[in-house]
Amino acid sequence: MAVPKKRTSISKKRIRKNIWKKKGYWAALKAFSLGKSLSTRNSKSFFYPTNK
């Protein structure tokens, strides 16, 4: 049966947790930025219907 040999230090655990949190932060920031550009119609990668 596989068992870890030593306990992970608190500092290493904290570093890994912060990396994990930072990934979520950047994903949320990108989503917010995309939503903002869509709402202001400044996005260059989406086509908007023109009402004439």
Swiss-Prot record:
Gene: rpl32
Pfam family, one: Ribosomal_L32p
Name of the protein this chain belongs to: Large ribosomal subunit protein bL32c
Single annotated GO MF: structural constituent of ribosome
Keywords annotated in UniProt: Chloroplast, Plastid, Ribonucleoprotein, Ribosomal protein
GO cellular component, one term: large ribosomal subunit
PANTHER family per the UniProt record, alphabetical: 50S RIBOSOMAL PROTEIN L32, CHLOROPLASTIC, LARGE RIBOSOMAL SUBUNIT PROTEIN BL32C
Keyword Plastid: yes
Subcellular location, record wording: Plastid, Chloroplast
Keyword Ribosomal protein: yes
Recorded family membership: Belongs to the bacterial ribosomal protein bL32 family.
GO annotation, biological process: translation
Main location: plastid
Organism listed in the record: Morus indica
